[in-house]
């Protein structure tokens, strides 16, 4: 894509994983509530490419979208225990502002950072912990209805629905990525659920690179690595986006140490 990519929430964990992985592959416009230090910027990106604003600010978002070809929308309150007033303002209202500004500016596509919390209530007492293990074939594939387990998950489900609306009503290409458990270097330690939904930094960067480059209408995909033990299907991400993950939590012990020969 020749036009700049707007990345909201650029200073957060997901944003930094993306920028460290594919920072040299695109022209960026970065937006965050806080200034970004030089070590958080990819090569070729300067302070002139950083916008210190809030996604709930309609005027700021309208200006940020000018000339943009694609948006990766990560900004919001990331806390699973976040209260309603915060997720309503930052995650729901903020996401609607992003979608509306993207449409008004003629942006082609938006990749929306949804979350595993949008479907976490599928993890019932009768299914866990078996669903986290290799001998269980239960899979969520993105066609199921949201089933959030907290208000943060409700806000992410609302964001997915907003994306559906703006695709249907305005023709905006939208992909919602239900992100798993993102960690660098190794999967979450001593956390079976986290290892089943592990997303490595390099797979995260590659997945969002494909969100920028691929053609799609409206999609919900799961953002995890190619883990042997998983309960989220990544087949749709592979088929529609061309996602080719490289990492697998099974290459590590439950304690997060590399297995022999890996």
Which residues fall in each region the model found?
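Conserved Rossmann-fold NAD(P)-dependent oxidoreductase catalytic core, especially the SDR/UDP-sugar
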Residues: 97-143
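Glycine-rich NAD(P)-binding loop of the Rossmann-fold in SDR/ketoreductase-type enzymes
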Residues: 56, 86-97, 154-155, 199
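Conserved beta-loop-beta element that borders a ligand/cofactor-binding pocket
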Residues: 160-185
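Conserved C-terminal active-site "lid" loop/helix of NAD(P)H-dependent oxidoreductases
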Residues: 219-221, 226-244, 260-261
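NAD(P)H-binding glycine-rich loop region in Rossmannoid oxidoreductase-like domains
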Residues: 47-48, 52-90
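Active-site helix of classical SDR
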Residues: 141, 151, 155-158
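Alpha-helical substrate-binding/gating segment
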Residues: 178-187, 198-219, 226, 241
């Amino acid at each position: 894509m020749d036009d700049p990519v707007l990345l909201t929430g650029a200073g957060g964990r997901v944003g930094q994983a993306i920028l460290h992985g594919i920072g040299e592959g695109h022209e960026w416009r970065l937006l965050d509530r806080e200034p970004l230090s030089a070590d958080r910027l990819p090569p070729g990106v300067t302070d002139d490419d950083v916008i210190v604003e809030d996604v709930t600010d309609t005027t700021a978002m309208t200006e940020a979208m000018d000339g943009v070809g694609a948006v990766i929308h990560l900004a919001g309150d990331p806390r699973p225990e976040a209260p309603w007033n915060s997720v309503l303002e930052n995650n729901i209202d903020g996401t609607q502002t992003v979608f509306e500004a993207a449409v008004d500016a003629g942006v082609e596509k938006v990749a929306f950072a949804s979350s595993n919390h949008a479907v976490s209530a599928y993890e019932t007492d009768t299914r866990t912990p078996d669903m986290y293990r290799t001998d269980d074939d239960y899979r969520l594939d993105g066609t199921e209805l949201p089933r959030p387990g907290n208000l943060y998950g409700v806000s992410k489900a609302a964001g997915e629905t907003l994306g559906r609306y703006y695709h249907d009503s305005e023709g905006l290409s939208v992909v919602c990525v239900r992100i798993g458990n993102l960690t660098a270097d190794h999967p979450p330690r001593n956390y079976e659920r986290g290892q089943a939904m592990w997303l490595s930094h390099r797979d995260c960067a590659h997945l969002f690179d494909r969100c920028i480059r691929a053609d799609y209408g409206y999609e919900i995909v799961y953002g995890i690595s190619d883990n042997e033990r998983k309960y989220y299907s990544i087949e749709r991400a592979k088929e529609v986006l061309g996602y080719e993950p490289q990492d697998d939590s099974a290459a590590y012990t439950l304690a997060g140490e590399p297995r022999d020969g890996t």
